[in-house]
Each structure stands twice: as C-alpha cells, then as structure tokens.
Amino acid sequence: MIQDLTKYLAEKAQSSQSLSQLPSLLAPESNAQVGLILTERFINMPAEIVTPMYTMLQEEIQWALEEKEPYQFSHYLVLSKAYTEVASKLDEEENRPQKKGKKSKAADSSVFYFHPEDEAMHHHALGFCNFEYTTQGDEGASDAKRTFQELGIKPQGHMTLVEASKFSTMIKAIGEYLGGPA
C-alpha cells in the first residue's frame, strides 16, 4: 500500500515543475526520508488550532528521536485539499431549453484552499502543486455542496514539500498568518 501511495504521489508531482524533485526523493534507492502529513479537520474546527497541532507534532517527533525511533525525516510532504469553482450542472439543465437570452457564468479557474495555512506553507516550501484526483467524484457532486451560490466546487489534491530544517520556521509563519497561540 505504501508503494502504491508513493507511486501515486510521484506521478502527480511530475505535472509540477516546482515538485520535480519529489519522485527522486520518494524513489526506493533514495536516502531521503520523507514524512507524510495528512491535513484534514472538521469544517467547524477553527484554524487557530493548526499551529499548536503542528507544534505538538514537532515535539512528538523530537521525543521519538530521543527514544531512538526512526523519525529522522529530511523532508515533509503535506497533503491537503483545494478546489476550483465549476458551473452548476443543475443550472445548465434549467437553461438548456432557452437557446437565446441569459448565458451561464463561466467558472473562474482560480484555485481556493480548504485550509488557509496552506498559503503560509508555500513561502517555506521547496515546491507545491495542485493535482486532479485519479478517481473523480460523481459529476453532480459539486452541486450537492452548493448553498446559495451560483457555482459548485470541484475538489482536488494539494501537496507541499518542505525541508525538515525549515519546518519550525514554517510553523511560526503559520502561527503569524493565522493568529492564535503558537
């Protein structure tokens, strides 16, 4: 399973010039030790808890190293989610009979982040990219999350590669960016 995940992430990183080194870091013959951080939290969980969570992770890794556990990472790969806005399929169906008149708004191709800290991480990263999931959700799924908006959302993956030596600085920057306790 780890090999499949490694292969998947290396494949997705190839589409990004800023993450071109990731496949070689993840290769079996590489001496690099890449720690994988999965970032997912409840929707109503405030962003201010992010900095203490990363600080606790850093402390636990340090304690593990003191216990001679194999947690000596050279890099961290942070997986998160992003999205783009897409035109609603429901609106297209409603407007289909009308050949003339109001045209539907085209969705902007801007990428938005589910987690605001992702933007702060970019300043300390070796590279980052968004990627399309290999297995896409149902086409109507973007309409299911639509509430009082003209556009739906299309989720995609987001990965950020950070050198372990810059991890502490990144945590401080996240704290400054989000506010809250450090």
Labelled PLM ranges:
Residues 1-182:
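Intrinsically disordered, low-complexity, positively biased terminal segments
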